[in-house]
Amino acid sequence: MYRIESKIDTSSSEFKQNQEAMKNSIATLRERLGQVKLGGPEKSRTRHVERKKLLVRDRLEKLFDKNTPFLELSPLAGYDMYENQAPAAGMVTGVGVVHGREVLVVANDATVKGGTYFPMTIKKHVRAQEVAMENRLPCVYLVDSGGIFLPYQSGTFPDKEHFGRIFYNQARLSAMGIPQVAVVMGSCTAGGAYVPAMSDETVIVRQQGTIFIGGPPLVKAATGEEVTDEELGGADVHCRISGVADHYALNDEDAIKITRNIIENVVKEKKFELNRDEPEDPYYDPEEIYGVVPPDVRKPYDIREVIARIVDGSRFQEFKELYGQTIVTGFARIHGYPVGILGNNGVLFSESSMKAAHFIELCTIRKIPLVFLQNITGFIVGRQYEHGGIARDGAKMVHAVANADVPKLTVIVGGSYGAGNYGMCGRAYGPRLLWMWPNAKICVMGGEQAADVLATVKVKQLEKAGKKLTQEKIDEIRKPILDKYEQEASPYYSTARLWDDGVIDPAETRDLLGLGIAMSLNADIPDQKYGVFRM
């Protein structure tokens, strides 16, 4: 493959301005990540440690093989929500390595409101199980939770994707032959008791872990019986009497050793084999991305300059280079794995939509993972393009994305607006993982456009009533709309609500994509049942 010839002048003032803006954005990201990784308030953390319990991230460090990467999911879930009571939504999830195989972990943080479940905690737990299901990853649940956070109970209990979905997923995962292991390291109360009960194997820590459907206060209220936590559902009860738990651990460290032994004895399935080459660093420094990407998502730049800084050797075999030039498509390798890349270089026209559909079908039939680099304002609008069938041609691209059964990974590197989000494999189209850069924006349309549309509607309504607005009044209508769209288009607003799997440092994109591809190969890639339709 040919090496991309970069046209970026790294000594230019524009490059340095872009670089400074991105570094500031990354500093903000790191500060926010550092804060949520502390967990709950200092008082809660101190009390937790005084009880001889390991903090959640210390538990994970001991669980995983030394010097192996941890692909954390949604670390800023719940950010700036719930009056900031739930950093990381009170839970750590992600993909780590235990005895050489990738596992999906879901770990409650008991320093955050006793590990109770907020609505976003449930969404985060369910999303982690979805990742496990799609990629056939064994699940390890480090349980230390008081159940649902009752002030938000209406958003946690009865709906399809609420608390019950966790247990439904466990049953389905087990039926698929995907191991489920629970480690009870603290409270496991009410509905949460089904996590260990529905796991294939369960470990419980003595004098610390408890499992019961109804705790001592509820038992007394219902039956008049007075009983302690340990008498009702401690390790001795469940390992010696009920049989709910299978392994008796002396403390957190012992529980983790037992868990590692369990995973060691799980039959390791053979990964799907891609034709992998020896990994090669990009020819251009990935940190140069900071200076390539302007802080204003409305300002265009060549997506090839980003591709050159994430692919092996900066080599890229472009497909249909001279046709539909507002989308760049082509083949490359990331950490040795073959990938098909689609990146935006402007609005999507009929030609670029058909080109993308053709390329996606090529990758699907060849079983090559797809990487989408989103920087898209949407599909072209206007009389000429509607007459030319942009809706029909855009639908071809959407069909191709939806039906591509190869691993798909999406990175929002700039704007992600409207139907452009759909065509470029947004959350609804099943990417195995989706990340955002800290400069990115995600919205149904730009704030300026939304303000113009809503202001125009208001003006026409008043004109029909014989009234006319001054420009000052029109600006008053537009301002709250602009402010609202600016806030809600933020990557932090998105990631708090799990519209993505995390906001990331652009320089880490390549490594995260490599981890994502490696993870995805635990599942088979099915055969495509039809040929390639040339567009």
Regions from the language model: what does each represent?
Residues M1-M535:
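Ligand-binding clefts of soluble mixed alpha/beta catalytic domains
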